[in-house]
A protein has these predicted regions:
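Helix-loop-helix hairpin linking two adjacent transmembrane segments in secondary transporters
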Residues: 20-63
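Intracellular juxtamembrane helix-capping segments at the cytosolic ends
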Residues: 1-8, 197-210
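Short amphipathic helix-loop junctions that connect adjacent transmembrane helices
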Residues: 111-127
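Juxtamembrane intracellular "pre-TM" segments in multi-pass secondary transporters
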Residues: 66-98
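Helix-to-loop junctions at the C-terminal end of transmembrane segments
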Residues: 142-155
Length: 338
């Protein structure tokens, strides 16, 4: 995520983060779809060999990534100061809890689900990929419109809470109808739809909410939360599997999702700000110039990098009026296209 932030323009970063989120979600589902089939062909040792080869391919693909020619460094704050700033922001913490809970539930489910498909749906392990793949396609069919609505019509908070509710609904179906093959598949389908929506929304929301100067720090905390969630999800899934009580297992996961929903109600609607990078004009008093810039209607955040001669600005385009544009032109010494 940090590398992606380095090689994308500030104004394109939200789109890039949403695309990365969907890629992560797809990778999980495709892996779980192909895993049983590959294991039946090459065994566990062969599966690890395939994983190693794919890791090497991923390293080779990094050669195609554009070289970073401009490094964004913040000399005004140390790393610990940035970390302190990030962990004190309530909405960012709720997003960290969200990615933790999402990946905990996903990992726990995919330790728990195979035994359910074998016992109640009577689907052999080698055929589980044929279950997951259609569910993936169906979930994407519903997930893409939800993401478009969230971004285009500024309904992110509503779609976000609806997706968590969808996860809960899928788990409730599994609690009360896991013995039915069709209810089991329906519950998994609803979970997949909600999961893919959440996986795309979380990085996008994080990019919107994190301060410019601490964005990489926020991404690091979020990524750590994600993998911690996967770790605890694997541990929890194994414990639930040993209970040999399906209803209790699904109930525990549903309880976690309900707690997550209650925490997420505290999220405020993200501000839909545009991030732009502008060349820094020749000014003697940078602090005074920054203060004047922040006083302009529609300018919400400014980070100046004197060594790079650029200014990173978050702008509320809907609040900009003709007077604001004239003030921007005066401060930058030329017309600013926003």
């Amino acid at each position: 995520m940090a590398l992606l932030a380095d090689v994308t323009r500030e104004e394109q970063r939200t789109k890039a983060m949403a695309a990365m989120g969907m890629s992560i979600g797809l990778s999980f589902v495709v892996a779980f779809s192909l895993g049983p089939w590959l294991t039946s062909l090459v065994g566990i040792s062969g599966l690890f060999f395939v994983t190693t080869i794919m890791g090497l391919i991923a390293i080779a693909m990094l050669l195609l990534v554009p070289k970073v020619t401009r490094h964004h460094r913040n000399y005004q704050q140390g790393y610990m100061a940035q970390l302190k700033q990030v962990i004190q922001m309530g909405d960012l913490n709720r997003l960290h809890v969200s990615v933790f809970a999402l990946h905990l539930l996903l990992t726990a489910m995919f330790i728990y689900v195979p035994s359910q498909l074998i016992e109640f749906a009577h689907i052999p392990l080698a055929s589980h990929g044929l279950v997951y793949l259609p569910l993936l396609v169906i979930s994407l069919f519903f997930a893409f419109p939800s993401i478009i609505i969230a971004e285009k019509y500024r309904k992110m908070r509503g779609i976000f809470l609806t997706a968590i509710t969808g996860i809960i609904a899928g788990l409730l179906l599994l609690i009360f109808g896991y013995q039915s093959k069709y209810v089991l598949l329906a519950g998994l389908g609803i979970f997949f739809i909600a999961f893919n929506v959440m996986e795309a929304l979380l990085p996008s929301w994080l990019s919107k909410s994190a301060p410019i100067q601490s964005k990489a720090t926020a991404m690091g905390v979020n990524a750590s939360s994600q993998f911690l969630g996967a770790f605890f999800g694997g541990t929890l899934g194994g414990q639930l599997l040993m209970l040999h009580n399906t209803a209790i297992g699904w109930s525990v996961l549903a309880g976690i999702a309900i707690i997550w929903l209650l925490i997420s109600f505290g999220l405020a609607q993200p501000r839909y700000l545009s991030s732009i990078v502008l060349p820094l004009p020749q000014v003697q008093q940078v602090n005074e110039w920054t203060t004047q810039l922040l006083a302009i209607r529609g300018i919400e955040e400014v980070v100046v990098m004197p060594d790079q001669q650029v200014a990173y600005i978050k702008v509320d385009k809907q609040s900009l009026d003709d007077a604001s544009r004239r003030d921007l032109t005066q401060l930058f010494g030329k017309e600013v296209a926003i």
